[in-house]
């Protein structure tokens, strides 16, 4: 096999490489136009005090690090990071555990289980704005069937999204409902790839269901769990529709995560340069998290 691969590699000459590059060039140009160019422009704007009310500010590079240094002394920015940390940690942990539990329950090949898998995926395939509107209705006392049912039982509950103590956790609950099927799907796919032979041998030796999971299935699916958690962690940093629809960052700033804070700086106060700097820092954070968790996942893999 190695000899065959070496022969193929040596058989590709400059003309063939040029032909391959020519074929890929349209895709490369499109990728650069849609992603790299806007990202580069965002970075350039972050080096200026850009605001639409002062056109000359778009080309003012006299203090290129002012926005980044200013963020370090901005209490609302640091508060938004803390809110983001609480939201990300709670949702990723909850979604990973729920996804793992649901995957274990649905790891069977029956018609009922197949139907249940489809039902479990419904929240994930809904447009995010639709999911947000569903929870807006459920959290609004005047129209919520949940609140009306509790009121009929003489157990009235105040709106969770207008209470500073519960608003963030209400968003975390809605986000978990919407996205735990994603982690379930990835973990379920990994569970179905676990070799049958070790499981059967362990059953013959009298291993319990918990022992089968802990010593055989969990080590095998651990990389998939890490990947699922990584994707959800990155998506939690991009959280926007639920917060925009349910609380608009309130009450006060209790649900104002970092990207929503950048949104308000750009579109409420027209501080484009500062908002761009926040967006660049968020992007750098996402890349750093991707590298860190990817490295941890590679080390924890039984094949790594």
Predicted regions and their residues:
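Short, Lys/Arg-rich, polar N-terminal cytosolic tail immediately upstream
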Residues: 1-15
């Amino acid at each position: 096999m190695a000899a065959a691969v070496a022969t193929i590699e040596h058989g590709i000459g400059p003309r063939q490489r040029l032909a391959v590059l020519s074929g890929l060039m349209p895709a490369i140009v499109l990728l650069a136009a849609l992603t790299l160019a806007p990202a580069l422009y965002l970075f350039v704007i972050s080096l200026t005090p850009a605001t639409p009310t002062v056109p000359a500010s778009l080309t003012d590079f006299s203090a290129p690090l002012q926005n980044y240094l200013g963020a370090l002394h901005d209490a609302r920015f640091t508060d938004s990071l803390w809110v983001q940390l609480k939201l990300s940690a709670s949702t990723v942990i909850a979604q990973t555990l729920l996804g793992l539990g649901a995957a274990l329950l649905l790891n069977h090949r029956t018609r009922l289980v197949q139907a249940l898998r489809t039902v479990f995926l419904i929240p994930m395939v809904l447009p995010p704005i639709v999911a947000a509107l569903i929870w807006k209705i459920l959290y609004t006392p005047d129209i919520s069937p949940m609140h009306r049912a509790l009121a009929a039982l003489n157990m009235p509950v105040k709106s969770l999204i207008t209470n500073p103590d519960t608003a963030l956790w209400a968003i975390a609950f809605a986000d978990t409902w919407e996205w735990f099927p994603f982690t379930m799907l990835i973990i379920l796919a990994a569970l179905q790839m676990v070799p049958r032979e070790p499981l059967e041998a362990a059953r013959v030796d009298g291993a319990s269901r918990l022992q089968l999971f802990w010593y055989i299935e969990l080590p095998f699916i651990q990389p998939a769990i890490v990947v699922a958690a990584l994707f959800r962690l990155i998506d939690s940093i991009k959280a926007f529709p639920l917060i925009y629809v349910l609380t608009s960052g309130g009450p006060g700033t209790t649900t104002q995560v970092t990207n929503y804070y950048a949104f308000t700086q750009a579109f409420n106060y027209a501080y484009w340069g500062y908002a761009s700097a926040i967006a660049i820092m968020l992007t750098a954070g996402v890349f750093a998290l991707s590298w860190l968790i990817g490295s941890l996942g590679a080390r924890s893999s039984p094949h790594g």
